């Protein structure tokens, strides 16, 4: 189902001896959201395991199934970001007959790696910006000394520059304003425009 949280899916897969989903344990999102945004970690994404998705057309309410070969996935992009189709479930293929003990251990190691380097203890929506070609958004932000910079209750994480956390009572405007400031500063100092991974809904955003 599209609403299953990725960490929940990761643990279920490991307990059933299914390999290939261990990396999803630290991703703060759902199966449907991950496919829609083509979210991932390094070179990994659920698109690699996808067979098909069931979608509902939000205009006609027609439900249909789309095979992976008919979906044009790109870096942090899928056509579902631009059409009227909402993902309601997906068929995914993982390798069977894995060693359950080893899979659980790998899953826990991956989670520890995330919690050691990312603000897993605070509310966030994961990485804010796409990585520019041959560079890293977090590295650019950190080089400008922006970690810890705040607008309202929204703060650039002190652990990782490409995360915005709700450190108190952040609202959506605080977060959008902080995203805009980051983009302006990185463009001014580095000559690079950081493109958001996240989608803006209800805002006049270019």
Regions found by a protein language model. Name each.
Residues 1-31:
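Anion-binding (especially nucleotide phosphate/pyrophosphate-binding) glycine-rich loop
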Residues 5, 28-35, 42, 128, ...:
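Gly/Ser/Thr-rich beta-alpha loop segments that engage phosphate groups in nucleotides
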Residues 22-30, 36, 122, 149:
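Short glycine- and Lys/Arg-enriched binding-loop motifs that mark or flank ligand-binding interfaces
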Residues 34-37, 73:
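Short Pro/Gly-enriched beta-strand edge/turn motifs at strand-loop
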Residues 37-44, 64:
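Core subunits and conserved enzymes of cellular information-processing
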Residues 46-48:
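Short glycine/proline-enriched turns and hinge-like loops at secondary-structure junctions
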Residues 51-55:
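Short polybasic amphipathic segments
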Residues 56-177, 184-185, 189-206:
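Phosphate/pyrophosphate- and phosphate-bearing ligand-binding catalytic cores of soluble enzymes
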